[in-house]
A protein has these predicted regions:
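Catalytic cores of the polymerase beta-like nucleotidyltransferase superfamily
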Residues: 1-166
Length: 166
């Protein structure tokens, strides 16, 4: 705003409600939800509560929620995720929001600078940046993903096949 750049109402609402969203997300995570589901639940709750107080049109609430959800996705840069993120329609808003969060004092481990450098890099440099992600984080990966058991795509289960043949 100070630099007289265009700022959408959705971006402003996302910024104003960010602390409330973070509180709701922490509460949902304490209830046992994985981080991304907690974020989604918190976003829905914050938006529904705000709609009761002030009229926020859907054309603003949907981009708000997308900006919030992309904050989580911006931290997941492995594989082809970073390149796909650059193609996202709301990448620029999410990136600007990320920089704003860093300027406000959130410790995001230089994530904003990484994305700034990534955008300016050529394809070879981008590949190198992605390959170095694990090394920069001390080799630790975020393995909060849920693991699913093997999927059976059609056909009887092995136990059923034996009983059907008998």
């Amino acid at each position: 705003i100070r630099r007289e750049l265009h700022v959408t109402p959705a971006f402003l609402c996302a910024a104003i409600l960010w602390p409330v969203l973070q509180q709701q997300q922490q509460h949902a995570e304490h209830e046992g939800l994985p981080a991304y589901q907690a974020l989604q639940k918190a976003a829905q709750k914050v938006i529904s509560e705000q709609i009761k107080r002030i009229g926020i049109p859907k054309r603003f609430t949907l981009p708000m929620q997308e900006i919030w959800e992309l904050q989580w996705q911006l931290s997941r840069r492995q594989g082809g995720r970073a390149d796909r993120m650059l193609e996202h329609a709301r990448f620029r808003a999410a990136y600007d929001f990320l920089l704003l969060r860093e300027q406000a004092g959130e410790n995001l481990h230089n994530l904003g600078q990484w994305w700034t450098d990534y955008q300016a890099a050529d394809p070879e440099q981008r590949l190198h940046m992605q390959q170095n992600l694990g090394r920069e984080d001390g080799g630790a990966r975020n393995n909060n993903r849920r693991r699913r058991g093997g999927r059976h795509r059609g056909g009887p289960k092995p136990d059923q096949a034996k009983t059907d043949q008998a």
